[in-house]
Amino acid sequence: MADRLLAIIDPAGAKSFLAYSSIPVDQRGGIGSPRGKYKGWLGSLEPQAEDAGYLTARALIERGKKEKAFGRDGKLHMLAIAGDRSTPSSINRNQGMHRVVAEAPMVVLEEEVYAAWTRENAAQQAESLYRRYSDVKLIWAGNDLMAFGAMAAWEKRGGKPGVDAWFSGINTSTEALEAVKSGRMTALAGGHFITGAWALVMIYDYHHGHDFADEGLELRRPMFAEFTPALADRYIERFSGGFDGVDFSRYSKVRNGKLKRYNFGFAQLLEPQS
């Protein structure tokens, strides 16, 4: 889709910028890189999605160790419910999860399934997987909805999420944040939704004569924050009404002359205010 849009937009002399996801290299054909064939394609910014998978899987496994949620073989047994097999977001989140598993020899990843990002599919698949793998107590999910589906299937068996099985998810829905606060969800990462705001900061700087090219034309940056119950509470308190109170000029190189490198991590927006 992006390649077709560039072919329409660029001849008209309009500038363009891709936020959230660039065009995968293996799908570019003759498109090339920004400011090449399409001069008006300024660049792209995407969240480092692997971090979300890594942070949540790591926290989930650490909680499993703390709770001594070991199977009969003395290992931690985990299921992974991913979104899909093909989108960069899903692939990268899954890679982050797999990296943690590779670093943890006491963890057995029993099976990885794909639930198309939906609560209903995840619940249906989890119900079958729980019967198949009786030692599983850790369930990693590629988003919050699939985590809730897996929780519902666990509760249907008479279990209690956060008590006798532990779940992780990705996103910052109010339901997910409340689940972290209550203890039903053990690990949650999010904050990537604000990529659009960071992209506007970069475009603002470019428009005002400070080209972001000195940091690269296609940026993939850490953005995900790991939410503790305290941070979930702070997020709800601070941002439940929106983000109008955030002074994004602080993150602009034009407006903040001291800034040498863009920092697009979401965690900075959750820091205590003086």
Task: Pin down the residues of each PLM region.
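Flexible loop/hinge segments that line or gate small-molecule binding clefts
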Residues: 7-51, 74, 176-177
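Hydrophobic alpha-helical
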Residues: 1-14, 97, 108-178
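Hinge/cleft segment of the Venus flytrap/periplasmic-binding protein
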Residues: 76-77, 81-85, 198-274
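Conserved acidic residues
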Residues: 42, 137-138, 186
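Structured segments of extracytoplasmic/periplasmic soluble domains
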Residues: 8-15, 59-67, 100-104, 128-132, ...
